[in-house]
Amino acid sequence: MSRVCQVTGKGPVTGNNISHANNKTRRRFLPNLQHHRFWVEEEKRFVRLRVSAKGMRIIDKRGITVVLAEIRAAGKI
């Protein structure tokens, strides 16, 4: 399973760790992903999604039904 948010599409990005002596080593910045069950009232069931914290805020703002319809239309689930 990939580390990608199903709502926003955010995935890992790369960058550098930089020490006090300005030595640079490569690293990955991972998104804050959570497995979360959302209750969908229209379907009378839970839907389990792998979403970032930002994705959860989007669902809170727009509603799970709207977001779920967009995800299904895009073929992500």
From Swiss-Prot:
Biological processes per GO annotation: translation
Keywords: Ribonucleoprotein, Ribosomal protein
GO cellular component: a single term: cytosolic large ribosomal subunit
Chain positions covered by the region annotation Disordered: 1-20
GO MF entries: structural constituent of ribosome
Keyword Ribonucleoprotein: yes
Pfam families linked: Ribosomal_L28
InterPro entries assigned: Ribosomal_bL28 (IPR026569), Ribosomal_bL28/bL31-like_sf (IPR034704), Ribosomal_bL28_bact-type (IPR001383), Ribosomal_bL28_sf (IPR037147)
Keyword Translocase assigned: no
Family to which the UniProt record says this protein belongs: Belongs to the bacterial ribosomal protein bL28 family.
Name of the protein: Large ribosomal subunit protein bL28
Organism per entry: Pseudomonas fluorescens (strain SBW25)
Record lineage: Bacteria, Pseudomonadati, Pseudomonadota, Gammaproteobacteria, Pseudomonadales
